[in-house]
Amino acid sequence: GYGQQLDKVLHVYGSAYVKQFYDRAFKLEGRFDESRLVYHTLRAYQEVEIGPYRIYPIPAQHGNFEEDCLIFAIQHQEENKALFYVHDSGIPNTRDLLFLSNKGMIFDLVSLDCTGQGQENSGAAHMSLQQNLILIEKMKTFNLVHDETRYIASHFSHNGGLTYEAMKAMSEVHGIVTSYDGMVIEY
């Protein structure tokens, strides 16, 4: 089985669409071990609490664009800190930003997809630095960020064509930190 070294149950969270892949993998492997791995299906806009975290799954602008992929607004309820995790997604639509605003979300940290790096437009399913800047301005319009919010550009690939140094130089002038493997952020 899977997770034999685990002394606790591993809880996995994702969309119904991802659950199909999860189930398929176990079926192909001929292994099911729900005593060690438990899948929880998340639905867009339905708040879920996991430990001290309040989480709002939001449809990503990715995949089939039918709520099959999710991005996450995560609030640590005890510390009253919030993270907007926007990877594998284009710019969230106005409806989604309004939803988060109506929930009173104000993000202390925003982790941005920047697959397109310095390209003018990375398409609808990912973002570039230029699209990151557009999203940041939209979040300001909806009062989803404050003056001390930290922005991290991440989720790069060779498709963007920039080295780490070039990406860092391009993003830091906009107050955006370029991530790297092993990076730890305290906020």
Question: Where in this protein do the model-derived segments appear?
Answer:
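Short, conserved catalytic or adaptor-binding loops enriched in Gly and charged residues
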Residues: E29-E34, V48-E49, A169-M170
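Hydrophobic packing residues within well-ordered alpha-helices of enzyme cores
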Residues: F21-A25, M167, I185
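Active-site HxH/HxHxD metal-binding segment of metal-dependent hydrolases
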Residues: G1-S35, H40
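Core dinuclear metal-dependent hydrolase active-site scaffold
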Residues: T41-N102, G182-Y187
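Cap/insert and terminal regions of metallo-dependent hydrolase folds
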Residues: G90-M183
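Active-site regions of enzymes building and remodeling cell-envelope glycoconjugates
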Residues: R36-H40, I55-Y56, S171-T178
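Alpha-helix termini
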Residues: G1-D7, L28-F32, H76-E79, N102-G104, ...
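Hydrophobic "anchor" residues on beta-strands that sit immediately upstream
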Residues: V12, F84, L109
